[in-house]
């Protein structure tokens, strides 16, 4: 499932979609709880995956045919987003209606009903932090799953700065970046190796708890049971970056309508994620104001003639706008 949601050997943690503080919560236990919610959705046979953006809301209904790692897409639909700005919900009623309508349209396309949903979160002031821990390997000298769990549980989430209390933020993802065994660094999977001291470096992505709660509330209001929330930056990178790109190091920038999600990968792991509160809509506004076009005309011009790469052919001649 790692290529789809980031589960599997990464032991990635998702926060409780209904919220909750990070201070004393056990990351590994929360990961297990997340897996249980996904298994419940799998037993139902299908669920909705929602990309809740500032400009549009995209929905896909996927079906599990025995293997959770290989879901099948039954239907896809997208609608103009409402109630979302810069990647966060700012009008609950509008966002709930947009989600409800998009899911209903996708259900008609798929010919099925869904009752569970996984959603993305772009905003919420994402913050990358690191944590590390070292524990003694259990008797016998070979690293077991229990030793891995022990090391992960020994990691403590760094406290927030003085301007924010720890209770104001919640963990969205927590993922081991590398393992150390008796001073040997850069291990991908220590299980089965012999040693005395096992260490782990953990990347933790936290977001504002209120942003998480609002996503969960919007899903519940739309009669959907939330099974998880995923960072847009992380999900975009998993869908775009090849395995060797993730291993050797790569950045992924998801230029959205109202905000852009940025993620960095190294050695196959997410090592940094952030949000830039600028997106394609701001480019459209610049074109509109600079040339005196209305917004729709500027958006059309941007889509048809704009490019993220400066090409020689684009520097010559006039562009028709009529």
Residue positions per predicted region:
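Nucleotide/phosphate-binding catalytic cleft detector across ATP-hydrolyzing
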Residues: 1-55, 60-250, 270, 294-295, ...
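Glycine-rich phosphate-binding loop of actin/hexokinase-like ATP-binding domains
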Residues: 202, 248-288
């Amino acid at each position: 499932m790692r290529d789809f949601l980031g589960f599997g050997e990464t032991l990635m943690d998702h926060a409780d979609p209904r919220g909750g503080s990070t201070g004393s919560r056990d990351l590994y236990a929360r990961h297990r709880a997340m897996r249980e919610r996904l298994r419940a959705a799998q037993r139902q046979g299908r669920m909705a995956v929602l990309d809740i953006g500032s400009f549009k809301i995209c929905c896909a209904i996927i079906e599990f045919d025995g293997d959770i790692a290989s879901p099948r897409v039954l239907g896809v639909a997208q609608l103009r987003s409402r109630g979302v700005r810069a990647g966060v919900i700012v009008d609950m009623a509008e966002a709930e209606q947009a989600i409800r309508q998009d899911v209903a349209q996708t259900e008609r396309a798929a010919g099925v009903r869904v009752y569970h949903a996984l959603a993305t979160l772009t905003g919420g002031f994402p913050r990358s932090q690191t944590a590390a821990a070292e524990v003694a390997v259990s008797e016998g000298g070979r690293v077991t799953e229990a030793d891995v769990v022990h090391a992960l549980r020994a990691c403590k989430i760094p406290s927030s700065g003085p301007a924010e209390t720890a209770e104001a933020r919640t963990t969205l993802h927590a993922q081991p970046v590398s393992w150390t065994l008796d001073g040997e660094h850069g291990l991908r999977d220590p299980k089965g190796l012999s040693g005395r001291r096992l260490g782990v470096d953990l990347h933790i992505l936290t977001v504002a708890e209120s942003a998480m709660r609002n996503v969960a509330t919007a899903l519940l209001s739309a009669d959907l049971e939330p099974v998880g929330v995923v960072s847009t930056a992380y999900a975009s990178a998993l869908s775009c970056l090849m395995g060797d790109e993730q291993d050797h190091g790569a950045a992924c920038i998801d230029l959205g309508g109202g905000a852009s999600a940025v993620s960095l990968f190294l050695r196959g792991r997410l090592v940094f994620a952030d949000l830039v509160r600028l997106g394609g809509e701001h480019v459209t506004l610049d074109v509109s104001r600079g040339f005196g076009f209305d917004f729709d005309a500027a958006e059309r011009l941007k889509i048809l003639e704009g490019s993220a790469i400066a090409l020689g052919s684009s520097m010559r001649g006039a562009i028709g706008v009529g």
